[in-house]
Structures are given as structure tokens and as C-alpha cells.
Amino acid sequence: MLKKDMNIADYDPELFNAIQNETLRQEEHIELIASENYTSPRVMQAQGSQLTNKYAEGYPGKRYYGGCEYVDVVETLAIERAKQLFGATYANVQPHSGSQANSAVYMALLKPGDTVLGMNLAHGGHLTHGSPVNFSGRLYNIIPYGIDESGKIDYDEMERLAVEHKPKMMIGGFSAYSGIVDWARMREIADKIGAYLFVDMAHVAGLIAAGVYPNPVPHAHVVTSTTHKTLAGPRGGIILSAADDEDLYKKLNSAVFPGGQGGPLMHVIAGKAVAFKEALEPEFKAYQQQVVKNAKAMVEVFLERGYKIVSGGTDNHLMLVDLIGRDLTGKEADAALGSANITVNKNSVPNDPRSPFVTSGVRIGTPAITRRGFKEAEAKELTGWICDILDDAHNPAVIERVKGQVLALCARFPVYG
């Protein structure tokens, strides 16, 4: 018999210590990776529930196993809340990740070898938008579009490429683009050539849910997202649509199950349901508004200190600091900041002369620092410290001073108070 007082600490101290150390790291480090966030204890409670024991292949009301009456309630709650949150008429909450949600869309809408227009990874796209090392680049004929000299998406080039190559699907969305995407313009281009418009809104889903970034759901045939990042839920994926096309919805459902996955992770779906409910609350909108304010405040300081920001600013939660021309690589900047308990990620920038393993940029995002309570004053102070390190990245004294300042700031703003 399993006893409720069983615990990891006594049974597996090695694992427990790793978990404890990660908990401490999150509290004592400032998290600036744009794709990371802190989920609520309510979400973690759902994920740690006995729902993890239940197999539920199929969809609510159409399962291949018995005993699914309660997990049907859980999944239906998640579906209806996701639809309400984004103004969709269809939602699939089963994808285990954003990448698996994306692969389901490819499977539902395309055949191997079909032409796809996607954002160049080096210009801010994502691996699943056509990178040659990813399934998308291996199975499909990818035509990349990018940004212009100002750092903004070049819609004229996009239209020219679309007319020339006539892709069956166009992809909107990004992993390192700080501007606002014109979803309506993209749909116009897609309609002009008879293509599907598929939008991956993973990075800005929380901003969209709060109404502080344009919603692609009314414009795209299909939209996917992760449920973490700005949405601040559990790690997972969703697929949405407002196309009012039952045939499309059936194809999407079939591409998830049985096409790409077996049993859904019901404990994670419960966590998604909680996160969607939280995102419908008024305070979530205030949080997302602050995310953007903090990002703009950080950009202001970077520019004042003489650092180049790709596109010259930000209209969302992230920014890309361009280090081309400086005697500092993205990899070195990442390591130096990490030594001061500031976590970022090295990132390629447009026309980057260095390899993706070294890079000439760092990507910075504000969802996590905003979640722990930072406002513009803290964001600006932090950016000053970052610039101090980037100015003198090989000086241990500077790194040690900033680390002390970081620890003091983290103590003032605990993640979980």
C-alpha cells in the first residue's frame, strides 16, 4: 500500500538535493530568459495530483479507456477556458509541447515536400518554422523570410516570396522578434496565393490573452502556443482556431491523436486549466502590461549606455542585444552574467558572423522578473548592472559586486513569498 507520507527527501536524497538546489537557484538568480516564467503553486498542485495516474486516449466523451468521467471534466474545462481566453471556436489542449503542437499542424495541413514560408531562424524565427536541423526543414521545402535593415518584418519581401514560390502554408510567429506582427497583412498575403496561415504565438500568448498584443486567432487558419512562457502555465502546448471549419478541426485532432501522440498528460492538462483561469483574471492583464513596461524600460537603459538593440526597441516582452563590433561574444556575455546570478541566453542576431554556438547577441525577456514583482525602477537598475558587466566582462571584481546587488534584490522580491 502506498502511504501519503512518503517523501523524496528520505528515499532519494540525491534527487531531493538537486530539486532543493534548483529551488534556491530560482530564488537567488534573476531570470531573464525570454521563454521562462514562474508558474503558480495552484498549477503545480494540479500537476502533482493523482490525475497523473490516469490514461485517457481519445477526447472527452470519446475515450478508448473506461473511468474517464472526471478527466473528461478536467479536459473540457481547459478547452472551454482556452477558447474563451483567445476568442477561438476550437481548442486542443493535449499537445505535450509547443513543438508537438506545431508538428501536428504540419501533419494536418501538409504533405512531405510541400512548400512552406517561415521566418528565418537567424532573423528571429523558431526551429520548427523550417530550420534544416528540425523535422520542419527536413520534411518540407522551406522558403525563409526575414527582417529589413530597420529590424522589422519585411512584408513586401514576404509577399514577393509568397507570389514567387506559392507555399501551401505561411508561418507567423517568432522566438526572438521584439516588434508587433501584422497578422491581417499576413492573412491578406496568404489569401492572395491560396495558402494556409499558421501562427505560432508561443512567445506572446500571455500578452495576447491580456489584450496588450494583437490576437492572431481571428486572422489565422490555425494558431498554436506553448502554455508556459508569458502565459505562465505548465510546460505544454495548445492548438486553437476560429476558422469555423469542422473538417479542419477533425484533421487537427487526428494529427494530435493518434497521429503524433498517445495518451494525454491529464495532470498537465489540469495545470493548463488552472493557468487559463488565472489568465482570465483582471490582475493578469495588469501583469502583462507591466511586462511590456519593464521591457521598454530596459531597452531605454541599454540604448543610453550605447548598446544596440535589434529593431531599435521593443513592443513586447523581449529584446535582442546586438554585440557585433564589440570584443565580446554572446557566449561570453551569457557566462559573465551567469557568474553574477543573472540568467540570459546567447542568441544569434541578423547577419551574425559567429556560429549559433557562440553568437553575437543575447536575448533578454521580462516575464519572470515581472512575475516576482519588479517594476520599471528595478528593471532599469538591473539593466545598469548588466551593462556594467558587458562593459568589463572579464573583471571578477565587477561580477562579484553585481552578484551581491543581485542577491540583495532577489531577497527583496522572492519568487514564492
Curated annotation (Swiss-Prot):
It is found in: Cytoplasm. (6S)-5,6,7,8-tetrahydrofolate binds at L121, G125, H126, L127, S355, P356, F357. It is an enzyme of class 2 (transferase). It catalyses: (6R)-5,10-methylene-5,6,7,8-tetrahydrofolate + glycine + H2O = (6S)-5,6,7,8-tetrahydrofolate + L-serine. GO terms for cellular component: cytosol. One of its GO terms (biological process) is tetrahydrofolate interconversion. Its EC number is 2.1.2.1. The keyword Transferase applies. This is Serine hydroxymethyltransferase. It comes from Shewanella sp. (strain MR-4). The lineage of its organism: Bacteria, Pseudomonadati, Pseudomonadota, Gammaproteobacteria, Alteromonadales. The gene is glyA.
